[in-house]
Amino acid sequence: MDPVTPLEQALHAARALVLADLVAGQVAEADVVSLVEDSVVQRRWWVEQWPDGVTYVAGLVAQDVQDALLERYGRWPLCPVCPTGDPHALDVEPELGPDPHWVCHKAGVKVASVGSLGRATGGTASS
């Protein structure tokens, strides 16, 4: 058995973090999980081309899934910080960097790290 490469470790971690946030938001249906898998496949190629980008994969997968959900179903994840006014989605920051987190630009606050939305929203916490 071959050892797990840093690339595979990063991809598995990104998958797990984004799935944890989808579960916390109760939107981890089969078709949505397929969006995660599609992103992981695309990002595998991306990191193979630019190995230094391996630490950015979790944030990029979160953004990919967020964009795909917006096109198909609507905004995700909805901001838990701003209960009044128009519902709006959280954004991933940094857009290209390590240690991604969800932020509400309207309130100007960090809500949760990618993978930890359950703690911030009262949903299922990631382990």
Task: Show the residue positions of the predicted features.
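N-terminal alpha-helical interaction blocks
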Residues: 1-55
